[in-house]
């Protein structure tokens, strides 16, 4: 997890505005994506951390699990989930990114193959069947539990515009990081956004 950054916010107290810090967290992964090996290595370390990737989505099953978690397919509080980039199907969103990014290269590769068995029919499927990660996930959180504890739902939903700006900025600043889906969770104490 990246070290929380903070920005100033103003709070009205005793007839005057006072400045306070608003925490900003940029998580590069979570235990739900961490491989069994990474969990085992981390468990053996005093710090509980590992240098092994834990933001990687390693196969189609992991991607399906991310879809269920991020979209709360198992929950009745779907009204507290907002997808602001992509659709309500993260698996298809990732497949679409693969098509957009790799289809031309796949066709060119296939045109250069003399043997049919070396041609790639579906690049997403090929990566899923390999040992390579198929996607990764980051989490952006603005504010912390102390900040959000006393905020009502209407105030929380104002964050949609802020998170939209975060996605636009990420696309602009890191254009090679392709975003398939961005979903905000308002169902926890501190709203946060999952980006795949």
Whereabouts are the PLM-identified features?
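N-terminal nicking endonuclease/strand-transfer module with a His-rich metal-binding environment
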Residues: 1-196
């Amino acid at each position: 997890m990246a070290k929380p950054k903070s920005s100033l916010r103003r709070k009205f107290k005793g007839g005057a505005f006072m400045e306070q810090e608003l925490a900003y967290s940029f998580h590069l992964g979570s235990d739900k994506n961490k491989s069994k090996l990474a969990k085992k290595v981390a468990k053996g370390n005093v710090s509980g951390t590992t240098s092994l990737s834990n933001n990687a989505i390693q196969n189609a099953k992991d991607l399906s699990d991310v879809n269920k978690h991020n979209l709360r397919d198992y929950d009745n509080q779907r009204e507290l989930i907002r997808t602001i980039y992509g659709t309500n199907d993260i698996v298809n969103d990732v497949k679409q990114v693969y098509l957009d990014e790799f289809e031309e290269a796949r066709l060119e590769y296939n045109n250069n193959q003399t043997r049919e068995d070396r041609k790639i029919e579906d690049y997403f499927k090929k990566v899923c069947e390999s040992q390579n990660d198929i996607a990764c996930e980051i989490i952006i959180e603005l504010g912390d539990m102390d900040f959000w504890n006393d905020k009502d739902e209407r105030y929380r939903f104002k964050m949609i515009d802020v998170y939209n700006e975060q996605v636009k900025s990420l696309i602009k600043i890191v254009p090679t990081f392709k975003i398939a889906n961005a979903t905000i969770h308002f169902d926890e104490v501190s709203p946060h956004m999952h980006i795949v």
